[in-house]
Amino acid sequence: VFGGLVIGQSLVAAARTVEGRPVHSLHCYFMLPGDPTIPIVYQVDRIRDGKSFTPRRVVAIQHGRAIFSMSCSFQVEEEGLDHQIAMPDVPAPEDLPSEAKLREAFINSAPEPVRRYWEQDRPVEIRPIDLRHYMSRDSLAPRQTVWIRATGRLPDDPAIHRCVLAYASDMTLLDTSLFYHGRSVFD
């Protein structure tokens, strides 16, 4: 089972127990591999319903065993300090090849694990700015810039948009950490 799926579904389960507060933090632990042939049961522990914060703990269970746990917190929206890093100077997503175009161009020459990955339909499309890490095993800087978007239409529900982002969070973090070591998630 793709870890991002479990993250996203866990956040959906937690968000359904909270009214009118966006998630502001989450922390996840993967404990066992999931079995894609059976359903996952999500148990939500309502830790506290405070004036400002609403923490939840979610455990994903299969075969009677915890495969994943998430601690997350929802917060009343309020004014506070705001900062962000400037957007890097990168091509716009429409100026980059789509995943379908990348598949056409590289799938026949790609290693088997890369082919299997690209052959799967996913609910989130990634358009990487730099493709070197897919084929190279050179040591690269441990950073990656990608554009992401849902492949289908999402409902007009900010909580669902946050859950899709949680899903996508598991799509590039591990590979980025391996770049410096000349490794890939496909190894």
Q: Language-model features: where?
A:
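Terminal targeting signals and extreme-terminal segments of soluble enzymes
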Residues: 1-187
